[in-house]
Amino acid sequence: MLRYELRGAAVLALVLALAGCGKKVDDAAPLAFVPADTPYVIANSEPLPDATSQRFAQQMKVAWPFMLDSIDHALAELGKDDPQSAAMRPVRALLDEVRERDTPEKWQQIGLGSKVRSAIYGVGLLPVVRIELVDVDAFRAMIARVEQKAGAKLTTAKIGTQDVWTFGNEAVLGLMAIEDKHFVLTAVPAAADEALKRRVLGLDRPAQSLAASGALAELDKTQGYLPYGSGWIDVRCTLALLIDDPSVAAFARGFGAPSPTFEPACRADFERIAANAPRLSFGYSTLDAERMAFKGRLELAPAIAQALARITTAPPGPPAGKDSFLDFGITLPLLKARDFWVEQAGAVAKAPFQCGALAPLNETFAEAREKLDQSVPPPMSDFSGLRVTISHFGWPDGAAKPDVSGIVLLGSSNPGFLINLAQLSVPALRDMKLGTDGKPVALPRGTLPAEMAGDLDVHAAMNPSALGVAVGKDEAARLGAALAAPAAAGGVLLDASYSGEIYTAFSQMIGRFADVIPAEQRQQLESQRKLYAFYATWFKRFDARVTVGNDGVDFIESVEFAKP
């Protein structure tokens, strides 16, 4: 019998060995320094593709001067009491070093590249930034020039054989180092021992790295993220570390605050909270020269996800076409939303948190339940959603008001009641007949104040689930089509879309109101105006969507770039 067990163990060992041979880990990659159990991480495990990198480089070259203007303004505000303070001098010296670097080639002259791998992650709760350098000597030379211009050298120390730069105060110690071809920046409690410093700097590697575990690669595969910027915040791990990570108490002592104390009940309560929303993950799903899409998922406990899905239908009307100036829809089922939150507050009331640190949370839920657990009168109780579509927006020179056309849809289980209220409030509407057939009817003269109405075409229409208003020429037909369209699929909390032309409008409005803006703000706003004007040439379309599914809430944002 023992012989067969040994033979089975040998076969298992061989299989594991072969599996290990098939999975080669790059020990020089930033992910090889990230602990597999890190509570948070965002990393690009592969460099950007050439086409994407070139697109970003073109945009950066134009935007860089305006970004510098904003930074200069912020620094002027921070240092207005003492612009030559010891703290401000190195910051200004660093800014001078990068001021003219508006192309990838110029950044490479100081050792930084656009096609490198990097990671931001936690060793415990302590943050670490790790970036590949393209030229270590050039980076060191840049730091030397910054020191010379600032008139002071950075404080240095040795951790083992590793040279580090240090900075900070009596509570926080910043560490900066060049390790092989990596630039590493981190922070620890000022009283941290050498063992902790070695861990955060990666001089002592984690027992298992994220590269070896493959967890980030698996996340990318499961969620459809690209390897150019993805990661997570692990809520369960983060809350557990508030109790277990000694750095929390060390920072508190450094700042002269009492060390937080967590009784045994806190661990169970933190786990209970984390079980409801265990993780937020995020990453690019598209990233090329034509389009960029970013997705985030807040994972939820199945019971909460299902309860949230039950109240999530869809905003009224279909999303507008890609030719709209702006389209925004949101689900607003007030009664169902109230019931959802009353249910959540009731769960806390039934089983209050026992952790002393969470006592305010018990009080908050109790107060919320008391305020929410009341009758909601119509028309508020009838609301189900809202959609605003602006088809056209312009503000011609010399015009007193903008030229706007579009439609508004208000979802309601009783839209006729809204019409009745409007007729009671506005005498001009009393004789208007509006059926539930979705056919637009022109609003009578006198409905709107003369200064607002002008020569506007204003129509209203209604179906059994929504009331709509159209403003502008040809918008009545659009309103009728929106009300006649089939109901959209459920599960949508919010959808939004807008044209890159919105930045042209922002730029024009800043210019239009320049005379009434305080003089000290005009220079900064002028830079912002120019930047908006450039945005209008870069971006063709923005789309955003928030949906609820069985696994949680998804946030999706996409950008279509304008053709150069």
Question: What residue spans do the PLM features occupy?
Answer:
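Structural boundary/hinge residues at secondary-structure and domain interfaces
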Residues: 21-166, 215-279, 293-397, 426-429, ...
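Single conserved position on a long alpha-helix in the C-terminal lobe of the eukaryotic protein kinase
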Residues: 42, 92, 96-218, 381-492
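Active-site proximal loops enriched in glycine and acidic residues that flank catalytic Cys/His/Asp
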Residues: 296-298, 330-332, 410-412, 462-464, ...
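Long, C-terminal catalytic modules of enzymes
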Residues: 472-476, 483-564
